[in-house]
UniProtKB/Swiss-Prot annotation:
GO biological process, one term: tRNA 5'-leader removal
Quaternary structure, from the entry: Consists of a catalytic RNA component and at least 4-5 protein subunits.
Recorded GO MF terms: ribonuclease P activity
Protein name: Ribonuclease P protein component 2
UniProt xrefs under Pfam families: RNase_P_Rpp14 (PF01900)
Organism, scientific name: Methanothermobacter thermautotrophicus (strain ATCC 29096 / DSM 1053 / JCM 10044 / NBRC 100330 / Delta H)
Compartments (UniProt record): Cytoplasm
Family assignment from sequence similarity: Belongs to the eukaryotic/archaeal RNase P protein component 2 family.
SUPFAM superfamilies in UniProt: Rnp2-like (SSF160350)
Length: 124
């Protein structure tokens, strides 16, 4: 089976986000939270077009809450709809959560450099 040439591949975008929760969420719970929020807001037919995939996660422990940053892949043209659905999520399995969108990027590398792990000279 041949690999599709770049001209025929579906264009993708990467959404950098941060999840703040009362307790630590596993990767499976986070995937479930993302899919549930998209399904509740847009329905099954629309959500199937998003082509969502959770690429990477970084965990940061703070005294007051657990923060997880991640990169979510979606199809180009649906970024705004995915971001709307993510910000609407506030509860999952009895745990309060808040999702903040950090930014949008065309590559995983630039999303990581800009939003997830900023360099030391970029500190305020």
């Amino acid at each position: 089976m041949k690999i599709l040439p770049p001209t025929l591949r579906v264009p993708r975008r990467y959404i950098a986000f941060e999840v703040i929760s009362e307790r630590e969420l596993s990767r499976e719970e986070l995937v479930s939270l993302i899919w549930d929020s998209c399904l509740k807001l847009h329905g099954e037919c629309e959500t199937s077009n998003f082509r969502l995939w959770l690429m990477k996660l970084w965990r940061f422990d703070f005294p007051d809450a657990v923060r997880v940053r991640g990169i979510l892949q979606c199809q180009r043209g649906y970024e705004r709809r995915v971001m709307m659905a993510l910000t609407c999520a506030h509860h999952h399995s009895g745990v309060r959560v808040a999702i903040h969108i950090l930014g949008l990027s065309g590559t995983i590398r630039s999303a990581t450099q800009k939003f997830i792990k900023p360099s030391k000279k970029d500190k305020y």
